[in-house]
């Protein structure tokens, strides 16, 4: 009986777990053995590892998503520009680079402006640089 009380006190003070969880019975004291695993510390270590690894994984996922979104936007832009009637754009702006740039900025195409301008230059559409 004293051994059981000693084991119980030891397990509660050092957070060691008893492998047998039924009420202590002096007739079955040999069944009560200490488990070497410290559950409390193990849970804390696991939680700390999870907190360290999670932000790195999320940052990696966000950077992968940013690359994928950029690729999809560029692909969509190229499809739209391939289908657009470039000559209509040229006649509408009549080579006025400032109006073209202003319209692009107004409608939120700032990130696409450089690529579209390069495409217009490649297609031979020249804008006056009067900005």
UniProtKB/Swiss-Prot annotation:
Glycans are attached at residue 61. Induction: Highly expressed during infection. Keywords: Glycoprotein, Secreted, Signal, Virulence. The keyword Lipid biosynthesis does not apply. Its main location: secreted. One of its GO terms (cellular component) is extracellular region. A motif (RxLR-dEER) lies at residues 49-60. Residues 1-19 form the signal peptide. It comes from the Eukaryota. It is found in: Secreted; Host cell. The RxLR-dEER motif is required for the delivery of the effector to the host cell cytoplasm but does not bind phosphatidylinositol monophosphates. Belongs to the RxLR effector family. Secreted effector that suppresses callose deposition, a hallmark of pathogen-associated molecular pattern (PAMP)-triggered immunity (PTI) and renders host plants more susceptible to bacterial infection. Reduces host plant responsiveness to salicylic acid (SA) in haustoriated cells into which host-translocated effectors are delivered. This is RxLR effector protein 62. It comes from Hyaloperonospora arabidopsidis (strain Emoy2) (Downy mildew agent). The lineage of its organism: Eukaryota, Sar, Stramenopiles, Oomycota, Peronosporales. The gene is RxL62.
């Amino acid at each position: 009986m004293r051994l059981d009380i000693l084991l119980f006190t030891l397990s509660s003070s050092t957070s060691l777990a008893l492998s047998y969880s039924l009420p202590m019975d002096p007739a079955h004291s040999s069944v009560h053995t200490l488990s070497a695993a410290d559950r409390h510390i193990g849970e804390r270590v696991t939680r700390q590892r999870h907190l360290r690894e999670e932000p790195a994984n999320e940052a990696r996922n966000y950077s992968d998503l940013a690359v994928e979104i950029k690729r999809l936007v560029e692909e969509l832009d190229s499809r739209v520009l391939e289908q657009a009637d470039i000559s209509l754009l040229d006649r509408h702006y009549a080579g006025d680079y400032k109006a073209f740039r202003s319209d692009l900025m107004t409608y939120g195409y700032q990130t696409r402006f450089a690529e579209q301008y390069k495409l217009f230059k490649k297609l031979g559409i020249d804008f006056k640089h009067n900005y």
